Amino acid sequence: LEAPEKVVDATHPFALEISKNLMNFCLTCKIPYIRYERPEEPITGENIYFVNDIKQAAEKAKTLGKHILLTLGSKNIEPFLCENFQGRVHIRMLPDPKLIDHLLSKGVPPARIIAIQGPFSVSMNQAMIEEYSIDCLITKSSGKEGGVPQKISAAKELGVSVIVIKRPDMNYPVSFCDKDEIINIHSK
């Protein structure tokens, strides 16, 4: 098996461990590492709050909403599984039986799990917000691919507060936000 000429890391903006492992692998094997970073979508408006992590999101949500929609998936949501949030949180996540079982084992009631594949249109986000009487939506700053513009638009139109978890800082040796630029530069 031949070693690759270079590695392009196009993982999720919040997949830090995978990126760290790839950078270490590339450093060890002396292979060029290139990061494709999804472009961030500009997020502005009233009732939008930025936080650094899931714990800060939980703290902020305590004061913002009675009915919260987590659009973060099923990982690292422990701060929302405490007494303060019982009966208040709906978790939108991929329809993976293992992930659903994991949440059920943590005591999340089935009625609080929305297992569905996204990303979603503005109208689909609005339908979920209205169906569950959501007054606070929590998302990650995961860009267009993560459906962030549609989530923000839906929440704004319905007057729902939004908590956005900012992307974690990571010092990538080489990083691009344009797929075509990576292809053009590195295909030569």
Residue locations for each model-derived region?
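Structural motif
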Residues: E5-K6, H67, D135-C136
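Redox-cofactor binding/interface segments in oxidoreductases and associated redox assembly factors
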Residues: V8-D9, L70, T139
